[in-house]
Amino acid sequence: MPSRRRVICGAGSLAAAGLAGCTAGDPADRAAPGDDPDTEWPQPGGTERYDCYRNEAVAPRESPSERWTAETSMPMARPIVADGRVLLFTYDKLEAYDLDSGEATWRVGGDDDEWDVRTSPIVVDGTAYVGVALPDGVLAVDLADGERIWHAELPDSPTTAPVVDHRRERLVVGTRAGLAGVTVDGDPNWNRETFSPVSALSSWGDEVYAGTEGGELYAFYDPDDLEGMWRRQLDGSVVQVALLNGGDVVVSTFGGVVDRRDDSATGAARWSHDALGSRGFVAAGNTYAVGRGLTSIHTRTGERHWTLDLDLKAPPAGAGDTIYTGGDGFVAAYAMGGGIGLGDYRGWVERWRYEVDGGVFEGVSVADGAVFATASNGDGATLYALE
């Protein structure tokens, strides 16, 4: 029986085929600034598909100012923004800040807490779900005040943020042993083994995709019982898996390979590019991969438009017609269209660059009309809200 996502995407693919003659140009030509100032970033990939792109989001396109900054330490992932809170996974803690003021509101984990936080969270309907150890499992936390709601014990330590199914009833989390299913009420219900620890996870509809440290890419359907569809061996540890509207997936692996995989033909490669996406990517009309530089690839055809050497180090986020990322001492915004030029020779790509106190390594997020990022140095780290 075809999955819900396959039925939806099949209709979308037929529509796309009918428009093929109209879509051969650069998709960036059709990108426009977002018009919604109230968007959120409720999970590490921004959306269930982990495409790291909010086309409707308002975000600064000109030199920003600081809404606020907050001192923190050892950030491990990009900020999560939802329901008036900014959440940050820092070493063994989950820290919460007020979205408007940056005031610290609550914390889970740390030396004086029983929980050892191991993953970034996902926020679903006012609750943050996060992977913890000692004991291993998923912890549900009230987003408003940090109250612990429940803990669901798992057979092994979590390695990825949870994802949620389309009914918002069931969570899937990656672990060192594979995948585990937990209801949003805290009832564990299944476990699936993989050959190595899960390093990347995404979902849409009733399908779940998992990448592992050993380079395996798995496709599953039905989060109620998680049935396998196919498995592919890739060339390196999987960094990111993003699901496309047309039914395929884009994957990046350690070492920088970015490729598109056919979801209807057991994961066969449609296109592949080497040494481009070791930091991750934004999957929009184009795929914008961040390695040391920024590369634009036509997501449908695989054509590489341009690559710019920008010394970037942060997993990117996209909003409207702009890509946001960072590096040593800066957060920056770049035009999706690549500015003016031909091939790799381009100008006016950078919309703005904001100096920060440290290196931006863990990724940026776009929400509530602002860009959120952390900068780390030898003395600690700072969480920035730029608008």
Model-derived segments and spans:
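N-terminal secretory signal peptides and thylakoid transit peptides that target proteins
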Residues: 1-20
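Extracytoplasmic/lumenal domain signature
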Residues: 3, 29-118, 122-387
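Sec-dependent signal peptide cleavage junction
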Residues: 20-31
